[in-house]
Amino acid sequence: MQVQVIVSQTLEGEVSTYVCKNNHVANLWYIDQTLESAREYLNGYEYDEHDPEFGKLQQLIEDLETGHYDGVARMAWDAWMVLCDIIKDDQPEGLEIECYQATVLEDWQVSK
């Protein structure tokens, strides 16, 4: 499966960056906000530190924070999916996970 980074620009010049996989688009700003919420969430959550899912989330957050952005789309999408899997069934109040369905990909410039 190919993961694409999509850049869209409004007439006013505002630029948004998205991650696209299987025609689903996630805005990187929302991923950043979700990670921020997840960090706060994990600080007050009784996770078993030996739980592999907990370790996976911690590693993804660390990689994103330290700028290991080689393959940014893959890393961001993986982080997105892990967060959705972990948090969706026990989503704390105020934490929103958003994902967009791409409908008109041809209207967006796909960055190389």
Predicted feature descriptions by range:
Residues 3, 28-41:
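A short, surface-exposed interaction/processing loop segment used at functional sites
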Residues 14-32:
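A short, exposed loop/beta-hairpin motif centered on an aromatic-Gly-Thr core
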